Regions:
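Active-site regions of metal-assisted phosphoester/phosphodiester hydrolases
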Residues: 1-178
Length: 178
């Protein structure tokens, strides 16, 4: 029940719908923004979070709530799912600051049957975020799809960094999958 309570609390951060493209099977879509701060420990006081919490992180983050919700939804490879957004999670963080569970976030999504389009297609971690210092070294943004959609993937890349960053459109690059 506490996970459902957190999903409700973060209803503006986890948006979902079923898209029904004409002449095609429906697509379950989840847009997510995981804040750069953990879930308030006071709300979790007295709750056993061990089945949800990352192994190498003392806190619970919205990425874990997302994972638990998806796990309970039991997406099938034959279903069309898109889960995308700013997860504020990059494996580079584990390298910079020691193990904090960022790789586990990605592994959990893979274990649920999701394919990370950008990383899968580019074969390397592709930075999507420009820090206030100007450094572009972390992939905070992710686009996951189930097998039925990944089988149709022709390409996945980021938007043009000079256009996005150069025109101050965002500090995040869009991820494009075709």
């Amino acid at each position: 029940q506490w996970v459902k309570d957190e999903i409700n609390f973060f209803s503006g951060n986890l948006l979902s719908c079923v898209a029904k493209p004409s002449g095609q099977d429906p697509i379950n879509v989840v847009s997510t923004y995981s804040p750069a701060w953990p879930i308030d420990k006071e709300r979790l006081n007295g709750i056993d979070v061990s089945g949800v919490k990352l192994d190498d992180n003392p806190d619970v983050w919205l990425t874990e709530i997302l994972w638990c919700g998806l796990k309970n939804a039991e997406p099938q490879n034959t279903e069309r799912w898109i889960v995308a957004g700013d997860l504020n999670s990059s494996e580079t963080f584990d390298v910079k600051w020691g193990p904090r569970g960022n790789k586990q976030v990605m592994d959990r999504m893979k274990d649920l049957g999701f394919y990370e389009c950008l990383r899968g297609f580019q074969k390397v971690l592709t930075p999507t975020f420009r820090h206030s210092s100007g450094n572009i070294e972390d992939q905070l943004d992710h686009l996951f799809v189930t097998k039925s959609l990944s089988d149709e993937l022709i390409e996945s890349k980021t938007g043009d960094s000079s256009r996005v960053f150069g025109n101050s459109l965002s500090d995040h690059l869009p991820i494009i999958a075709d």
